[in-house]
């Protein structure tokens, strides 16, 4: 596995599914700022072709397998919720506090552990981290505007975290 943070503004993303699984996935994508095209399970090739990512949730395995194969034939990366063999990528357990994004993944091997780790991270990095990230970003921008080299900027930001006792 290779963890990657994707810019949702650069992706054409589709979502196909039904029921509670579809609703959960739609919420997850909305929280990530992804503008998603909600498609029916019998989506046309014309609508699949421009996509780069396709999320499938709440469909039977046979239907999901067929849809995933069709999407892949157009170069679309596919995630079928809870069906590892049909996934080109996985979505980790997520804790989001403003711009701070923490994730935990077991590559699908132990979802319960990933969930427990997410809960632990959420307790350890609460809403106060939103302001902390903003504060650090402002200081970093100030240091960079002064023309400091990247290594020195990193050192100063790290020193600020230590000085404030955040970690």
Indicate residue ranges for each PLM-predicted region:
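Short amphipathic alpha-helix with an adjacent loop that forms part of the alpha/beta core around
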Residues: 43-50
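Short, ordered loop/turn segments at secondary-structure junctions
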Residues: 41-43, 82-86, 107-108
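Residue-level detector of alpha-helix initiation sites
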Residues: 20-21, 61-62, 108
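Hydrophobic, well-ordered beta-alpha structural blocks that scaffold small-molecule cofactor pockets
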Residues: 1-42
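An accessory alpha-helical subdomain
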Residues: 108-167
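Short basic, glycine-rich beta-strand/loop surfaces that mediate nucleic-acid
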Residues: 52-59, 88-108
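ADP-ribose/adenylate-binding Rossmann-like module
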Residues: 53-54, 64-91
């Amino acid at each position: 596995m290779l963890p990657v943070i994707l810019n949702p503004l650069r992706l054409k993303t589709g979502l196909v599914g039904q029921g509670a699984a579809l609703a959960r996935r739609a919420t997850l994508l909305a929280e990530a700022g992804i503008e998603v095209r909600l498609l029916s399970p019998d989506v046309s090739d014309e609508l699949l072709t421009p996509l780069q990512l396709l999320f499938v949730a709440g469909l039977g395995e046979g239907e999901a397998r067929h849809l995933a194969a069709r999407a892949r034939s157009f170069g679309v990366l596919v995630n079928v919720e809870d069906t590892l063999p049909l996934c080109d990528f996985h979505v980790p357990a997520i804790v989001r506090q403003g711009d701070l994004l923490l994730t935990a993944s077991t590559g699908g091997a132990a979802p319960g552990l990933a969930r427990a780790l997410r809960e632990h991270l959420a307790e350890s990095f609460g809403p106060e981290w939103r302001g902390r990230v903003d504060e650090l970003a402002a200081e970093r921008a100030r240091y960079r505007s002064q023309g400091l080299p990247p290594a020195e900027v990193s050192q100063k930001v790290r020193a600020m975290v230590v000085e404030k006792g955040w970690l």
